[in-house]
């Protein structure tokens, strides 16, 4: 509190007598003057608009009133001044407080009526209404996309590296093999995926996982040189082929409910029967890793590709070599059967696709340039369409005989490790080095017509074209929408103009 030197608290009657009335009145007037100055300084922050809102008089108006008061002839300097009393000062303070309270409440009522932004709030609301009208179609499109049902299951993400995936032949179950030797069984669906169980099968990396044709057993091959057969109903081990190979097993192929074949890193191929302990036969015709094995519906021939560039064919019934191809200066990584089992197509590490007539596997009859990046995986989608994938992270569809790039089915951020398709041929699953499994609905390939040899095509655009299952869109789709909109506007203008009345 600010103190004044002229104002003293009397301690006795003598000091009280020393205080005259003029001194007391002067001190009171000084305190009142400072209070008024403080109020003026606090009110100086209010701008002219706030003064108008509080119905305060304008500065010029105050000046005029002061002049009129000073020029009033009725003013008597000798008249008794009632302002010297304390009671009159209190009444003036109460009157000022009441007037300021009324002004504040009036301003508060005006602010409540105008909203937080006053008159600007109305213009802002108007702009938002215009914005809503302009973006109405975009909002509707976003809502429709959110409400649109999924056409494929969501992504599955694991902590461990996924080495292989395999669909169950009868149920909506997919098996995921991992680098730590475990197998995860998931029940998949468009609404979500559910982990059914995790089976610890191998002490080292599980490189391949397959179901038997009847779906009763799960077969796994591992780097620990073992093959394990697990009963899915009881989750118990049915059979263990310990040290099935002298080297790490890389590939496993199921022929039927009893027969299966295995291939290791040293090029040895063995054929097994679940009803026996020992292999039916064993052949070693190459010196490098077996990359894939396959057979047709007749199951008379077993074909194997290897990393040293050979396509080797075994006669199952005779248990001997049928034919071996000429060596290629590139790795043969994958293969598929097409055209009613009349064509075999092999993918290589240089991105090429070699075509063979069935039964004549000594040398290819045709060669396609492919995608110019290593083709590590191949899955037949239809009798004439294949999906290939590799290190670039893209899954591409191509037409076989004649060869055409159809476009991109799906994408991963890292190289793709495995591919598989379900029994109905509608759902494709892929895993990548990012420890994820993605699903792609490829049912639209059923509507693809056959391609003729003399059909005109643009190879550059076909290689980069995104198919319906892809998560990316084509730049041409944006302009096609604009063209469609222009055509609709033109039709509306023609309809509004009406038919021409010619004389």
From Swiss-Prot:
Region (Disordered): 1-131, 483-503
SUPFAM superfamilies in the record: WD40 repeat-like (SSF50978)
Ranges of Acidic residues composition bias in the record: 12-23, 37-56, 78-96
Each WD repeat, start to end: 157-196, 201-242, 244-282, 285-324, 327-366, 411-450
Compositional bias of kind Polar residues: 59-76
Keywords: Repeat, WD repeat
Residues annotated as signal peptide: none
Family: Belongs to the WD repeat WDR55 family.
Name this polypeptide is given: WD repeat-containing protein 55 homolog
Species per Swiss-Prot/TrEMBL record: Drosophila pseudoobscura pseudoobscura (Fruit fly)
């Amino acid at each position: 509190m600010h103190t004044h030197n002229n104002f003293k608290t009397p301690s006795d009657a003598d000091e009280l007598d020393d205080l005259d009335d003029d001194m007391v009145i002067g001190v009171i007037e000084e305190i009142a003057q400072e209070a008024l100055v403080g109020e003026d300084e606090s009110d100086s922050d209010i701008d002219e608009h706030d003064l108008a809102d509080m119905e305060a008089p304008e500065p010029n108006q105050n000046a005029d009133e002061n002049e009129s008061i000073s020029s009033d002839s009725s003013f008597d300097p000798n008249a008794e001044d009632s302002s010297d009393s304390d009671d009159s000062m209190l009444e003036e303070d109460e009157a000022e407080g009441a007037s300021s309270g009324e002004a504040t409440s009036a301003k508060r009522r005006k602010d409540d009526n105008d909203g937080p932004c006053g008159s600007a709030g109305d213009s802002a609301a108007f702009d938002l209404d215009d914005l809503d009208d302009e973006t109405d179609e975009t909002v509707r499109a976003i809502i429709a996309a959110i409400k649109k049902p999924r056409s494929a299951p969501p992504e599955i993400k694991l902590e461990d590296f996924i080495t292989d995936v395999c669909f169950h032949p009868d149920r909506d179950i997919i098996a995921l093999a991992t680098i730590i030797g475990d197998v995860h069984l998931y029940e998949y669906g468009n609404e979500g995926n559910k982990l059914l169980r995790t089976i610890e099968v191998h002490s080292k990396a599980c490189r391949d996982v397959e179901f038997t044709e009847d779906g009763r057993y799960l077969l796994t091959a591992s780097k620990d040189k073992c093959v394990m057969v697990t009963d899915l109903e009881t989750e118990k081990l049915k059979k263990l082929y310990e040290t099935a190979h002298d080297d790490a097993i890389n590939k496993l192929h199921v022929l039927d409910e009893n027969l299966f074949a295995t291939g290791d890193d040293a090029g040895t191929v063995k054929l097994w029967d679940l009803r026996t302990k020992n292999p039916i036969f064993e052949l070693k015709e190459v010196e490098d890793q077996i990359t894939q094995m396959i057979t047709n519906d007749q199951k008379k021939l077993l074909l194997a590709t290897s990393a040293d560039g050979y396509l080797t064919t075994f006669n199952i019934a005779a248990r001997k070599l049928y034919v071996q191809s000429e060596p290629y200066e590139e790795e043969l990584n994958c293969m598929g059967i097409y055209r009613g089992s009349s064509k075999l197509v092999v993918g290589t590490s240089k991105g090429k696709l070699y075509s063979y007539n069935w039964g004549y596997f000594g040398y290819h009859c045709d060669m396609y340039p492919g995608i110019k990046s290593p083709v590590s995986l191949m899955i037949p989608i239809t009798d004439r369409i294949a999906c290939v994938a590799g290190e670039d992270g893209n899954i591409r569809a191509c037409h076989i005989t004649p060869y055409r790039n159809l476009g991109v089915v799906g994408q991963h951020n890292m190289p793709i490790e495995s591919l598989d398709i379900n029994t109905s041929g509608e759902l494709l699953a892929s895993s990548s080095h990012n420890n994820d499994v993605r699903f792609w609905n490829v049912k639209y390939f059923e509507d693809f017509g056959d391609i003729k040899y003399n059909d005109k095509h643009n190879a550059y655009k076909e290689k980069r074209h995104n198919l319906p299952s892809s998560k990316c869109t084509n730049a041409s789709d944006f302009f096609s929408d604009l063209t469609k909109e222009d055509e609709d506007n033109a039709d509306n203008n023609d309809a509004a103009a009406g038919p021409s009345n010619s004389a």
